[in-house]
């Protein structure tokens, strides 16, 4: 009986995923993805697109506490799951 109870406690702790830290994409290139482990209080991933010339965009990615504000001709996407800003 004690073994069953101990097993249930361990399974519960593992399933709760206590203290989950969000992981966002910091950089994405042809060579791969650079992850960023978000600090406490940063519970969003973001990706921005800034048009540098017609058809050409500069991207920024990372962690944030709040979704960045859009500027002229920018697009911003915010999300809350691991690597959702790919």
Swiss-Prot record:
Disulfide linkages recorded for this protein, renumbered to the chain, are 24-45, 38-63, 67-78, 79-84
Q: Is Secreted found in the keyword set? A: yes
Query: Would you tell me the Gene Ontology cellular component terms?
Result: extracellular region
Keyword vocabulary terms for this entry: Disulfide bond, G-protein coupled acetylcholine receptor impairing toxin, G-protein coupled receptor impairing toxin, Neurotoxin, Postsynaptic neurotoxin, Secreted, Signal, Toxin
Q: What residue stretch is flagged as signal peptide?
A: 1-21
Query: Which PROSITE patterns does the annotation name?
Result: SNAKE_TOXIN
Q: What is its main location?
A: secreted
State the Gene Ontology terms under molecular function. Answer: toxin activity
As annotated in Swiss-Prot or TrEMBL, what is the tissue specificity of this protein?
A: Expressed by the venom gland.
Q: SUPFAM superfamilies from the entry?
A: Snake toxin-like
Where does the protein end up?
Answer: Secreted
A Pfam family (short name) is: Toxin_cobra-type
The UniProt family comment states: Belongs to the three-finger toxin family. Short-chain subfamily. Aminergic toxin sub-subfamily.
What does the UniProt record say this protein does?
Binds to the muscarinic acetylcholine receptor (CHRM).
Describe, as the record does, how this protein assembles with itself and its partners: Monomer.
Give the protein name, as stated in the record: Short neurotoxin OH-35
